Amino acid sequence: MCFLLHENLFMSDALVIIPTYNEKENIEAIIRAVFTQKKSFHILVVDDNSPDGTSVIVEKLISEFPNQLFIEKRLGKNGLGTAYIHGFKWALARKYEYIIEMDADFSHNPKDSKNIYNF
């Protein structure tokens, strides 16, 4: 079961999907790093019921980035691959033209997002 907290209202044709499980140490920094890029991205966090409070941090940030930051909370630890699939389905249903996957631990550099978008 998933919960949608906000609808896609701000204009952006590019979505960054960030799957999470116990990423409270990284999630705020990665979200802020994506939002500091010159290109206007939306972010979808797909959280697998993190017991460390990752989703609580994201929900607080949603008030700072309304209609740009979204969260889908899944009830169990379903894995990275299914989190990305969930995110892609969410993005396609909302007609995003560009969908970028990014891990919360900075193994993908947020600065590279604009290069992918300009490809």
Regions found by a protein language model. Give the residues of each.
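Conserved donor nucleotide-binding strand/loop of the catalytic core
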Residues: 55-94
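Acidic helix N-cap motif at the loop->helix transition within catalytic regions
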Residues: 25-29, 52-61
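Short, acidic, metal-binding catalytic loop of nucleotide-sugar glycosyltransferases
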Residues: 32-41
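Short beta-strand/loop segment that forms part of the nucleotide-sugar
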Residues: 41-50, 72-73, 102
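Conserved donor-nucleotide/metal-binding helix-loop-beta segment in metal-dependent transferases, i.e.
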Residues: 111-119
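N-proximal low-complexity "stem/linker" segments adjacent to membrane-targeting elements
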Residues: 2-33
